[in-house]
Amino acid sequence: MTIDSGFNHITVLLDEAVEALALRADGCYLDGTFGRGGHSRLILSKLGPQGRLLGFDKDPQAIATGQALAAEDGRFVIVQRSFAELGAEVAERGLAGKVSGILLDLGVSSPQLDDPERGFSFLNDGPLDMRMNPDQGISAAEFIATAPVEEIARVFKEYGEERFAGRMARAVVERREKQPFTRTADLAEVLKVANPAWEKGKNPATRAFQGLRIHVNNELGDLEAGLEAALDALEVGGRLAVISFHSLEDRIVKLFMRKLVKGEADNLPRNLPVQHKVFEPKIRLIGKAQFASEAELKANPRSRSAVMRVAEKLR
């Protein structure tokens, strides 16, 4: 497998995210979304000989890049798993409750988006796939070919926040009865015609494609599972930094952290005797939500929607 796919990726909030982890030279850290290794390389540069870094990714190309890095640096290990499974991985390695910091950089990477053969983009024609790991799960084409119109509309609306979801789903089903969808450009054209009110400066297929990608990869389900697993994996004083790129992701992260800041009392029945510690917060927030600087926005326009939230485990 070729390590350098020819598509560049500029790591978003690179310095800010690594700084947020408050690295210890001998700490054990976890990069839940290795990608092309931007964050991981910077973390490794700040760790001492006893420091360790464990990387996760589903994408075979990312794994190839990670394996090359692991061959260069014995402090680093890469595993081909979703960060939703980090709990099982750290348990197998005897690291549960011992991880010093965890970073999650959510969403699709530039190499995935820019490579037409991955099928993520409506701008460049390619096979309608959209899977982070092309060897697992069903492709976007398979979903579109078999799902009922109501399910397609739900995906467009719930995950893409597309207000014309029903109309676009009906257009998709009407067309697939004549000819199946196999290419991204083909689907994008049908969605374009079915969208009566394009947003200025935005491709009419944008939201529907986002919805499909999130559904095919179970991105929100993985995020919810990954956040819970991350909290259990962290040691007391360990930090969790999460970078999200759209409101659905950020809402999940924000609500998760808000719940833990309040403690567990809100989830208990009224008038039930409880120990005092359930009223105590499990985490504390580190600063406010962070966004890309003006300089980063100019250098990398894709960073405009990035928001990072950071928390520290208290108990």
Swiss-Prot record:
GO molecular function, one term: rRNA (cytosine-N4-)-methyltransferase activity
Keywords (A to Z) from UniProt: Cytoplasm, Methyltransferase, rRNA processing, S-adenosyl-L-methionine, Transferase
Main localization, broad class: cytoplasm
GO biological process assignments: rRNA base methylation
Residue sites binding S-adenosyl-L-methionine per the record: 37-39, 57, 83, 105, 112
GO CC terms in record: cytoplasm
Domain of life: Bacteria
InterPro entries linked: RsmH, SAM-dep_MeTrfase_MraW_recog, SAM-dependent_MTases_sf
Disulphide bonds in the chain: none
Catalysed reactions listed for this entry: cytidine(1402) in 16S rRNA + S-adenosyl-L-methionine = N(4)-methylcytidine(1402) in 16S rRNA + S-adenosyl-L-homocysteine + H(+)
Pfam families: Methyltransf_5
UniProt entry tagged with the keyword NAD: no
EC numbers on record: 2.1.1.199
Subcellular location(s) of the protein: Cytoplasm
Job description of the protein: Specifically methylates the N4 position of cytidine in position 1402 (C1402) of 16S rRNA.
Family: Belongs to the methyltransferase superfamily. RsmH family.
Descriptive protein name: Ribosomal RNA small subunit methyltransferase H
Organism: Pseudomonas putida (strain W619)
Upper classification of the organism: Bacteria, Pseudomonadati, Pseudomonadota, Gammaproteobacteria, Pseudomonadales
Name of the gene: rsmH
